């Protein structure tokens, strides 16, 4: 009866461990499979005319895809483009996944904003059409910016726009080391947007009273070590979020504080318009590149020591702990049963314990990641950025941990059950 009870206990432990490894929590404890697909609301997309003002949506009325497919013919007007939207805009709430293809970004506060980056490893210029949102919080159903990636951030509120600027090691979100980067914006070469269908919301527009506000004009420059994101509203939104200087980088387009090691929120004055100098307009590619405008002044600043969520590290730690606990329990039970059995059964138990240990170790390995980077993050013609360095984070390891753990737990449990059956 004792051995039968042991077998039943081992089966129960296996089932419980498997369920724990696969179950989507949706509470920030681990990557949630629900964040890897859109919500399938099947709400219609409004009409769209190229180079005309785009439709806006209340957040609750978003279509599955803002742009979808077949908006224009590929290569229309001699320009490349016309490809379908690769991600989705109706994203799961209050959860996250490093395989998410959510293309709805947010800029709400110093602790709650998103940046655009490649969905798969590649330069910003190569991957801007299919970029996805990476956020500092798990509220938006996106991928997470790993803790330690952002090494300085400066959030500024004005009456006409809100922006966040800073430095970091963005090899952790699949931007190659040394990539000077480029611009994400809602237009692109064919007005489908970079990324196609990418949209931005904010709760920081004073006129929206804290409700999500659809941002029609925004700009986000990204490189391997520098970022800037601005969301504009009002009559001068297009001019204050200009998108024609895509190789000029952050410091030329959005002069601001990029100091590393500082995380602050400030009120700010309105900056001068990009490319406008005493009534004349600079065009990218002109023989002489003018200097960047001075950074506007700011006031009423408050700071914190850093920003982070702890979710990727917590998820990895919890998953490893779960495997170690269930494996230890199975090995202990098998050893107890073995000591009361014959020498032959005892030998089998020792083999089983070894197999369990081996399988657990193989289920917790990490994937590949990019190296660290330092240097300027601006495009040609811009001033040199603050240097930054640091070990890159593996953005795919956390996303695949649940499936890896399920396999390793399953193998360990099967071996333990086999040993118990042999003893019977």
Swiss-Prot record:
GO terms for biological process: appressorium formation. Keywords: Cell membrane, Membrane, Secreted, Signal, Transmembrane, Transmembrane helix, Virulence. Residues 362-382 have a biased composition (Gly residues). GO terms for cellular component: extracellular region; plasma membrane. Disulfide bonds: none annotated. Induction: Induced during infection of maize. Residues 295-304, 327-347, 383-398 have a biased composition (Low complexity). Residues 1-21 form the signal peptide. The chain crosses the membrane at residues 404-424. This is Appressorium protein ROW1. It comes from Mycosarcoma maydis. The gene is ROW1.
């Amino acid at each position: 009866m004792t051995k039968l009870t042991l077998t039943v206990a081992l089966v129960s432990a296996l089932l419980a461990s498997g369920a724990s490894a696969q179950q989507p929590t949706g509470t920030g404890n681990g990557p949630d499979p629900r964040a890897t697909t859109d919500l399938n609301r099947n709400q219609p997309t409004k009409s769209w005319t190229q180079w005309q003002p785009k439709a806006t949506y209340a957040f609750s009325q978003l279509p599955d895809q803002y742009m979808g497919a077949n908006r224009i013919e590929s290569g229309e007007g001699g320009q490349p483009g016309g490809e379908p939207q690769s991600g989705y805009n109706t994203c799961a709430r209050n959860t996250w996944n490093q395989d998410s293809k959510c293309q709805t970004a947010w800029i709400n506060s110093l602790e709650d904003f998103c940046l655009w980056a490649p969905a798969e490893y590649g330069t910003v210029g190569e991957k801007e059409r299919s970029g996805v949102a990476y956020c500092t919080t798990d509220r938006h159903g996106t991928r997470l910016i790993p803790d330690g990636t952002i090494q300085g951030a400066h959030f500024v509120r004005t009456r006409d726009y809100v922006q966040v600027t800073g430095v970091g090691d963005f090899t952790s979100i699949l931007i190659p080391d040394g990539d000077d980067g480029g611009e994400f914006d809602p237009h692109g070469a064919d007005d489908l947007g970079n990324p196609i269908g990418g949209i931005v919301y904010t709760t920081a527009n004073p006129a929206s009273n804290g409700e999500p506000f659809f941002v029609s004009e925004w700009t986000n420059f990204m490189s391997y070590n520098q970022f800037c994101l601005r969301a504009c509203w009002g009559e001068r939104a297009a001019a204050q979020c200009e998108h024609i200087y895509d190789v000029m980088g952050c410091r030329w387009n959005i002069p601001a504080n990029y100091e590393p090691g500082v995380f602050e929120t400030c009120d700010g004055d309105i900056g001068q318009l990009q490319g406008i100098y005493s009534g004349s307009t600079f065009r990218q590619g002109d023989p002489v590149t003018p200097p960047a405008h001075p950074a506007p002044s700011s006031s009423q600043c408050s700071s914190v020591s850093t920003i982070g969520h702890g979710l990727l590290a917590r998820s990895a730690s919890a998953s490893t702990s779960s495997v170690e606990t269930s494996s230890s329990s199975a090995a202990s039970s098998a050893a107890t049963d073995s000591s009361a059995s014959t020498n032959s059964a005892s030998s089998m138990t020792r083999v089983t314990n070894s197999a369990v240990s081996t399988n657990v170790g193989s289920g917790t390995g990490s994937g590949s990641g990019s190296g660290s980077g330092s240097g300027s993050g601006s495009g040609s013609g811009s001033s040199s950025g603050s240097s930054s360095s640091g070990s890159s984070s593996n953005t795919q390891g956390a996303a695949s941990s649940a499936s890896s753990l399920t396999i390793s737990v399953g193998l360990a449990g099967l071996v333990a059950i086999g040993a118990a059956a042999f003893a019977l």
